[in-house]
Amino acid sequence: MHLVRWLICLIQLWIQLGAAGSVTLLDPLLIEIPNGKLRGRDNGHYYSYEAIPYAEPPTGELRFEVPKPYKQQWTNTFDATQPPVLCMQWNQFINGTNKLLGVEDCLTVSVYRPKNSSRNNFPVVANLHGGAFMFGGPSQYGHENIMREGSVILVTIGYRLGPLGFVSTGDADLSGNFGLKDQRLALLWIKQNIASFGGEPENILVVGHSAGGASVHLQMLREDFSKVAKAAISFSGNALDPWVIQQGLRGRTFELGRIVGCGQASDSVTLKKCLKSKPASEIVSAVQSFLVFSYVPFTPFGPAIESPDAPEAFITQHPIDIIKSGKFAQVPWAVTYTTEDGGYNAALLLEKQASSGRELILDLNDRWFDWAPYLLFYRDSMTTIKDMDDYSRKLRQEYLGDRRFSVESYWDVQRMFTDLLFKNSVTVSVDLHRKYGKSPVYAFVYDNPAEVGVGQILSGRNDVYFGTVHGDDVFLIFNVSFVPANRRPDEQIISRNFIKMLEYFALSTNDTMAYGDCVFQNNVGSKHMQLLSITRDGCENKQLNCFIQRCLIFF
């Protein structure tokens, strides 16, 4: 009799925890979703369920097409214990001449759930990885830091990159933005399935860094984004950055065809058919033909404005026009930058060349007018060579005056890169959203240099001060392999505050956002633009204004 009562209580407990697909105490590693059952891994303080397909493989006839939802039914339990593969890419961080990595069949999500006996369900953070739309992957931004805090479920997403994800002829036949469409389908998958993992589908926060941050903003510019997410954060990247929306992409796409043996194609239909017949490795390896030097320009293939008659077009207007129309998702959004974000792009100029021992920055004295349009992404936006040269001349005068390019003037070059590639667009996007949007818009700037950052890594220099460069903030949230894991005490505090900020934003019932003891100021309806300044000493709300090329903070 006692045994029967015990079994009844156990069954009732199982039902309360969510028998219909939710994580249960009976076997938290075994999850059931519409495709069948999958088994994850116990990692000590968290569970992982990795490389779960959300789309049919984008290969063969599905290459350069809108992704199709994954429909296969598993007869056996799916093994979700293997890490996700990289989408095929030409990766700038690989040493040597062959930088090809990854595979074409890569459209998966990975779910990481903390062990936490005090709660059964968790808010969800969905992360879109960065990498200039050209490289990177879901494992690039590690999950250990977030799992250690034990307060949110993390979902990472693989999406098509480079030419496989972003070729476009600008018409309906080869419209482009396949990587963005992958992201969109993955977010729908999360919304529909995350409850089975113990996630709260009503509390999904979408975040991204660099190209991932720009992707978040682009996703948000679709009105239906509010159906898949509650809020969003763009770290050091937004849709208005000059490297995001590609101009001249039609010409590069046909040039790509010529390089891989499709030079006979004179229209989009013929080109697309030919490209589908070529090995993916040849298409991706052709990226190197579009680089002027090193990894410049770092985004030869990226998001494009599509033709209105394109099938399932992602965006058909420039982001500025979309924001001004007010027809975008009205969800709370935060956009950020670091004080020296441009160090990621400028640091390569300090690398000493193997052949001469000279820094590349010295060559700018003779090649500024040739290289600047590619370094700062205005090559395709200028009507004439004269316009381009005039702008290049103006930039040099504004930031360097009459000084020469040298190691001594590097700091001002880096400041130029920060302003033009990251900082100015934050001010413009916040201003536009506060004028034409209804939901809260927040901003913050991070100023606390890491001991080792991408500046030192990309330049190979430890004798130069780079300041707070690209990633110094977000790498305190997501651990990365190329940055030392040991952190200063102040960074450990900031890391916990950042992760708590994500949880708070995902759970907020009144759309507010906070970091530590500081509450972000909503810019919608405010007289002045506000941003939160975060340093090793704490946080403080400040006023933000912008004059021509430079954004100044008034205390």
Swiss-Prot record:
Main location group: secreted
GO function term, MF aspect, one: carboxylesterase activity
Catalytic site: 210
Secretion signal, residue range per the UniProt entry: 1-19
Enzyme's top EC category: hydrolase
Reaction equation(s) it catalyzes: a carboxylic ester + H2O = an alcohol + a carboxylate + H(+)
Entry similarity comment: Belongs to the type-B carboxylesterase/lipase family.
Protein name: Esterase-5A
